[in-house]
From Swiss-Prot:
Gene Ontology BP term (one): thiamine diphosphate biosynthetic process
Name of the gene encoding the protein in the UniProt record: thiM
InterPro entries, A to Z: Hyethyz_kinase (IPR000417), Ribokinase-like (IPR029056)
Binding residues for ATP: 130, 176
EC number: 2.7.1.50
Transmembrane intervals: none
Pfam family, one: HK
SUPFAM superfamilies in UniProt: Ribokinase-like
Cofactor: Mg(2+)
Function of the molecule: Catalyzes the phosphorylation of the hydroxyl group of 4-methyl-5-beta-hydroxyethylthiazole (THZ).
Higher taxonomy: Archaea, Methanobacteriati, Methanobacteriota, Stenosarchaea group, Methanomicrobia
Protein's UniProt name: Hydroxyethylthiazole kinase
Pathway as given in its UniProt record: Cofactor biosynthesis; thiamine diphosphate biosynthesis; 4-methyl-5-(2-phosphoethyl)-thiazole from 5-(2-hydroxyethyl)-4-methylthiazole: step 1/1
Annotated family: Belongs to the Thz kinase family.
Record-listed substrate binding positions: 54, 203
Length: 275
């Protein structure tokens, strides 16, 4: 692992063991996600070694969550019925001690998305909050630019904003970007793995949340789970881009590359540093 200063020793041990545990335990990861990228999220979850399920019916979401190792909530194609179902699922996750990963897609773009995401972080025990700079900045109360589901940036220091929000919410926060920022309020990591093609296809942010959810299903150290997921997904992106002719072939190769990432690859190829 390349570190710029030295990363803490326990991270180096956990990263590899998390990927190994996913392949050995194949945890169920329950998604309540958007209909644009739902198939991509299911496939990337399978590729890392976990098992996806996408149950949305009010009558079964609580039961399904009880069987899962993690719950991923994604507000990319939001409506009022889905909001109610997400809260039912989240309350079940809290009851059974199951980690909740929230991807507040488009928070800051419309009042529905912003208010829903704000309500979720206020009323639910979120384990990992993952979003782009605009989304995280909005939820941190900063001036941010969000166009649709794309980030236009945030005013202020991104690392300080991420760390401050994590401390306030008592959860792990991931701000995605060219350099991903991962913080639980007291420990902060920067990850530089990835490739520009990842920003040229739809769904990579959603897929990253699925990978993080898969990692969070096998450890209670959600900072390590997030860093492992972000780095492993970024490494897969780097490998997929090597022979890709463009974004289309890159997307196909991304799934193959994710399936081939091994437990020691994050240690060998992860570009992670602590701050």
């Amino acid at each position: 692992m390349q570190t710029y200063p030295e990363i803490l020793d326990f991270f180096m041990t956990l990263f590899g063991s998390i990927l190994t545990d996913i392949r050995e335990k194949t945890p169920l990861v329950h998604h309540m996600t958007n209909y644009v990228t739902v198939n991509d999220c299911a496939n990337i979850t399978l590729c890392i070694g976990a098992s996806p399920v996408m149950a949305h019916a009010e009558e079964e979401v609580g039961e399904m969550v009880a069987l899962a190792g993690a719950l991923v909530l994604n507000i990319g194609t939001l409506d009022t019925l889905q909001i109610d179902r997400m809260f039912i699922a989240a309350k079940a996750a809290e009851k059974y001690g199951i980690p909740i990963i929230l991807d507040p897609v488009g928070a800051g773009a419309t009042s529905l998305r912003t208010k829903t995401a704000q309500r979720m972080i206020q009323e639910l025990s979120i384990s990992v909050l993952k979003g782009n700079a605009g989304e995280i900045g909005t939820l941190a109360g900063k001036q941010a630019q969000v166009r649709g589901v794309d980030s236009g940036g945030v005013n202020g220091d991104p690392t300080e904003i991420t760390c401050g929000l994590a401390e306030r919410l008592s959860c792990t926060v991931v701000m995605s970007g060219p350099i991903d920022i991962i913080s639980d309020g007291s420990r902060t990591l920067l990850c530089e793995n990835g490739h520009p093609y990842m920003g040229r296809i739809s769904g990579t942010g959603c897929m990253a949340a699925s990978v993080i959810g898969s990692c969070a299903a096998v450890t209670q150290d959600y900072l390590s789970a997030s860093a492992t997921g972000v780095s492993a997904f970024g490494i897969a992106g780097e490998r997929a881009a090597v022979d890709a002719a463009g974004p289309g072939s890159f997307k196909c190769r991304l799934f193959d590359s994710m399936a081939s990432v091994r437990s020691d690859d994050v240690d060998r190829y992860g570009r992670i540093r602590s701050v």
